[in-house]
């Protein structure tokens, strides 16, 4: 258990440039943010996927994600919900799994959603010291995208 004032407790991770924060999110087909998660900069993407998908994953949907989310447990969660996974296989996967390249082109919606958040200086530069304040700022901006 980390202390709340420790760098890890404040979603700060070490990198070459100093302390960094990584914002994980999922969005719908229109680029509206549905779920957010905040971690330190060195944290992996894949462990955040189950929490991001849990709340709004429905049968018949296609889940688009990049190679960082190519894990069997993520694909299993998507399949159990009755949705389809459109995730390219990592280079080191022994048996590559096919994905629909045409549907995968729509993955830029998540990149647009991230850029929409980072248009706001407070999110792009993380002026907030506390992770809870930064997360609240990101949530507020995410709500604005729905209006």
Regions found by a protein language model. Give the residues of each.
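Polybasic low-complexity intrinsically disordered regions
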Residues: 1-91, 138-142
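Basic, amphipathic alpha-helical segments enriched in Lys/Arg and hydrophobic/aromatic residues
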Residues: 75-82, 96, 101-147
């Amino acid at each position: 258990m980390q202390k709340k004032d420790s760098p890890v407790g404040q979603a700060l991770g070490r990198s070459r440039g100093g302390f960094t924060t990584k914002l994980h999110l999922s969005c719908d087909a229109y680029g509206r943010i549905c779920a957010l998660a905040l971690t330190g900069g060195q944290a992996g993407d894949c462990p955040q996927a189950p929490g991001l998908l849990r709340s709004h994953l429905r049968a018949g949907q296609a889940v688009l994600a990049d190679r960082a989310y190519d894990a069997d447990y993520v694909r299993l969660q998507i399949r159990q919900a009755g949705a389809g996974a459109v995730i390219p296989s990592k280079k080191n996967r022994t048996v590559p799994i096919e994905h629909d390249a045409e549907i995968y082109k729509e993955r830029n919606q998540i990149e647009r959603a991230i850029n929409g958040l980072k248009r706001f200086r407070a999110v792009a530069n993380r002026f907030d010291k506390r992770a809870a304040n930064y997360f609240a700022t990101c949530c507020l901006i995410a709500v604005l995208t729905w209006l």
